[in-house]
């Protein structure tokens, strides 16, 4: 491994941490409906647990209602039960072949819980990013010890990795501010 490899690996892993945070934040319910809250609902499909998006079309009907239309008519009841059992606080209602999923407005208390959850997810992402920095710095020290790079190269690479860390931590903070604003908007 070279100094450039260590930097590239750290960058890729930090980027992955940001992607994971974005995915986690998408699961957090806000006052508005969005199809992302149903992304992880699993449906029993011919005996196999299958992602809801594989067996139904999920769309927004309006700001507070999600529409779920199973591809097969016989799946309507199964999909409705899966959404109800997903522990998302949602109460789907079937209208013919379409399942309407109204998202109730969040109470003030629930909004504050969601903000805490968002901050917790962000802190986990920051910890992951810092751990990646630590691993990269240890790799650089090992390269220096093995005489694969000079002290100047190691110092320069550490500075660049620190800049990467700062950049990604700033991005985490930005994502959190956006999500908090979204959660607290009534």
Swiss-Prot record:
| Any GO MF annotation of the entry | ribosomal large subunit binding
Functional summary from the UniProt entry: Responsible for the release of ribosomes from messenger RNA at the termination of protein biosynthesis. May increase the efficiency of translation by recycling ribosomes from one round of translation to another.
Which NCBIfam families does the protein's record reference?
frr
Q: What is this protein called?
A: Ribosome-recycling factor
Lineage, opening ranks: Bacteria, Pseudomonadati, Pseudomonadota, Betaproteobacteria, Burkholderiales
Q: Which UniProt keywords apply?
A: Cytoplasm, Protein biosynthesis
Gene3D superfamilies listed in its UniProt record: 3.30.1360.40, Ribosome-recycling factor
Pfam families assigned to the protein according to its UniProt record, in alphabetical order? RRF (PF01765)
Q: Which GO terms describe its biological process?
A: cytoplasmic translational termination
Which organism's genome codes for this protein? Herminiimonas arsenicoxydans
UniProt subcellular location: Cytoplasm
Name the gene that codes for it. Answer: frr
Give the CDD domains listed for this entry. RRF (cd00520)
Gene Ontology CC entries for this record: cytosol
Family from the record: Belongs to the RRF family.
Q: Which InterPro entries match?
A: Ribosome_recyc_fac, Ribosome_recyc_fac_dom, RRF_sf
């Amino acid at each position: 491994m070279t100094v450039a490899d260590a930097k590239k690996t750290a960058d890729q892993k930090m980027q992955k941490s940001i992607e994971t945070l974005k995915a986690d934040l998408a699961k957090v319910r806000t006052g508005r409906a969005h199809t992302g809250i149903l992304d992880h609902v699993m449906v029993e499909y011919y005996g196999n647990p299958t992602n809801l998006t594989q067996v139904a079309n999920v769309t927004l009907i309006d700001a507070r209602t999600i529409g779920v239309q199973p591809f097969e008519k016989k799946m309507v009841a199964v999909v409705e039960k899966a959404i109800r059992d997903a522990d998302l606080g949602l109460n789907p209602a079937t209208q013919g072949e379409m399942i309407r999923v109204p998202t109730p407005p969040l109470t003030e208390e629930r909004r504050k819980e969601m903000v805490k959850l968002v901050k917790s997810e962000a802190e986990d992402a920051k910890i992951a990013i810092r751990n990646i920095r630590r691993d990269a710095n240890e790799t650089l020290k090992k390269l220096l010890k093995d005489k694969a790079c000079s002290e100047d190269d190691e110092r320069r690479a550490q500075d660049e990795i620190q800049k990467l860390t700062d950049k990604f931590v700033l991005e985490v903070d930005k994502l959190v501010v956006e999500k908090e604003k979204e959660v607290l908007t009534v």
